[in-house]
Regions:
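Residue-level recognition of well-ordered beta-strand positions that form the cores
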Residues: 91, 106, 131, 143-145, ...
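Pseudouridine synthase
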Residues: 28-36, 80, 137-178
Length: 178
């Protein structure tokens, strides 16, 4: 983890791809949360970190941690007001037909995967806007802008479009670029 910003209330780190954000039932160690907490304890500081949000294991990007519970609560409560720009870049299989568009579906978290429905079946409504940056050699470079932030939303929506993210075996993507 690389610390990119720190003040009296928050720490922002750059999480690498392949690292879980937080502990799960099966993975208790070597998460962004545990690594940052170990760093704080080793440095002799008098606080611990509190989780504000998560990124998927296969997503790299910036993560924010609070230094106290009050800050954590405030950031979580107003997260959608504070974070107005949630854009991601991904390489997907196939050359996208459209330059831009929107995917809307209802996502339901199952045990091993997130399922998607075009109709409200009790899942959480999710909306992803996409823009095709470049097409080449059977792949597309995409900019993905989340209107909502559901678990595995981008992964599921790209699969729904028939263009799974490269490296995402769970949702149909190839292992790597050929």
């Amino acid at each position: 983890l690389k610390i990119v910003y720190e003040d009296a209330y928050i720490i922002v780190v750059e999480k690498m791809q392949g690292l879980l954000s937080v502990n799960t039932e099966r993975q208790k160690e070597r998460t962004a949360y545990t690594i940052l907490n170990e760093y704080v304890q080793r440095s002799g500081r008098q606080f611990r970190v509190f989780i504000v949000h998560r990124l998927d294991r296969d997503t790299s990007g910036l993560m924010m941690f609070a230094k106290d519970e009050k800050t954590q609560h405030t950031l979580r409560e107003y997260w959608h007001d504070i974070v107005t720009d949630r854009r991601y870049v991904a390489v997907v299989a196939g050359e996208m037909e459209k330059d831009h568009g929107t995917v809307t579906s209802w996502l339901t978290d199952r045990t091993l995967y997130v399922s998607s429905s075009k109709y409200d079946d009790g899942g959480s409504k999710s909306v992803t806007h996409y823009h095709t940056i470049k097409r080449a050699n059977g792949y597309s470079l995409m900019e993905l802008d989340l209107e909502t932030g559901r678990k595995n939303q981008i992964r599921v929506h790209m699969q729904d479009l028939g263009h799974p993210i490269i490296g995402d075996g769970r949702y149909g993507g190839e292992e790597s670029l050929n």
